[in-house]
């Protein structure tokens, strides 16, 4: 019972309140005790206040009370609990595939040429090779693309791509638009759980039909998975991210590399909101983006494709005034399916779901970004490895909790297209 007993000091004297799940504020004006707070279920209310207090309000509404022999005011009826809240099913999805950067004819003339000889990173630059580290070209967050134009590539048998990422980083490659495959960093175990930077080399065999001489285009997408936090101040946050070196066997082609990462930072959502996916740079995650010509689809999905597919939908919530509801987005699928989904709500990046690793399946949709009394835009950027069918599987809104009361939350500015 003491868990529902709330002492509160006011300039007019102390107040003791029994009953509600949470007391937020108490104030005495004239002879009325004004209370605000939350109730998850119907609850009684009893108030002990300074001498002369003879009335009570709860969240701005008068509460009929009776005086007791214990010098308290007791509510005649319980305070109301939270009404039953219903969340809509998510439907009306539309989809579009991307990664045109993998096509040999893609126009990369506006991309940065990766030809630096020295780096600000603590990672050594391979001797005689250009710097490929993304940060040295101004790309610090999210995914980064590379395109290498190869000449004199006759006899090329395999490609070796060395790269550096944070936890669970991955790399996928295409040659002349044909998928070469995906490589990913291992899932940490107890001995590596605190490891901040992961490095490895992916080796891809070149298909026979692509071994002819002439011009070829090698396209590489790296999911960098953030920088080391460097809590010990050892400059580990300066370790390279992205490709670190490229080599070939069976041939010695000349390579000219170009790099593209995130666009200019969103002036409202900030630089951490977006990476270098084509859809991110084109605003596919934003409210109001014209997706009317996208393909209508339904979940669950089973796509066999290396690369990125975007899914968009809208949904409307109608949480009653005076109710504080916490809502999450839950994704569920066969854990053997290898794909990831970046989650954007009203243009805001709320996290990444890794289906075959987890453990997180529910992502909080913060009120303010979430319009609890309005229309919302949800976008998923799904990165598929192609070694399994990829989803999404089941995607649904989840009620994480609700109370009558709460604190009003202003809508967060979420500009769109």
Positions of the model-derived regions?
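Non-catalytic C-terminal accessory domains or segments of carbohydrate-active enzymes
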Residues: 1-370, 377, 383-417
């Amino acid at each position: 019972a003491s868990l529902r007993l709330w002492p509160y000091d006011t300039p007019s004297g102390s107040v003791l309140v029994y009953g509600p799940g949470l007391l937020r504020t108490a104030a005495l004006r004239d002879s009325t005790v004004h209370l605000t707070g939350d109730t998850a279920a119907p609850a009684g209310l009893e108030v002990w206040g300074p001498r002369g207090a003879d009335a009570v309000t709860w969240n701005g509404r008068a509460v009929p009370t009776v005086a007791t022999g214990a010098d308290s005011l007791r509510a005649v009826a319980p305070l109301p609990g939270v009404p039953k809240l219903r969340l809509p099913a998510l439907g009306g999805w539309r989809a579009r595939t991307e990664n045109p950067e993998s096509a040999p004819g893609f126009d990369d003339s506006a991309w940065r040429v990766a030809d630096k000889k020295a780096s600000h990173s603590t990672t050594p630059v391979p001797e005689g090779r250009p710097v490929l580290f993304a940060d040295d070209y101004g790309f610090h967050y999210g995914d980064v693309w590379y395109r290498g134009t190869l000449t004199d590539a006759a006899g090329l048998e395999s490609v070796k791509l060395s790269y550096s990422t944070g936890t669970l980083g991955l790399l996928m490659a295409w040659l002349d638009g044909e998928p070469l495959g995906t490589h990913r960093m291992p899932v940490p175990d107890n001995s590596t759980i605190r490891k901040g930077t992961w490095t490895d080399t992916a080796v891809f065999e070149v298909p026979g039909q692509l071994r002819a001489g002439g011009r070829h285009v090698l396209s590489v997408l790296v999911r960098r998975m953030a920088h080391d936090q460097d809590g010990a101040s050892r400059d580990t946050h300066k370790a390279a991210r992205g490709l670190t070196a490229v080599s070939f066997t069976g041939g010695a082609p000349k390579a000219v590399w170009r790099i593209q990462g995130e666009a200019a930072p969103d002036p409202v959502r900030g630089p951490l909101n977006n990476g270098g996916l084509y859809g991110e740079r084109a605003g596919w995650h934003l409210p109001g983006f014209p997706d009317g010509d996208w393909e209508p689809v339904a979940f669950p999905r089973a796509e066999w494709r290396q690369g990125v597919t975007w899914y968009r939908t809208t949904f409307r919530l109608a949480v009653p005034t005076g109710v504080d509801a916490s809502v999450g987005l839950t994704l569920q699928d066969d854990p053997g399916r290898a794909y990831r989904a970046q989650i954007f709500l009203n243009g805001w990046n709320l996290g990444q779901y890794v289906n075959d690793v987890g453990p997180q399946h529910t992502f909080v949709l913060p009120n303010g970004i979430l319009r609890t009394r309005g229309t919302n835009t949800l976008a998923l950027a799904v990165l598929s490895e192609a070694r399994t069918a990829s989803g999404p599987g089941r995607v649904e809104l989840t009620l994480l909790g609700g109370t009558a009361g709460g604190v009003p939350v202003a809508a967060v500015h979420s500009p769109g297209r």
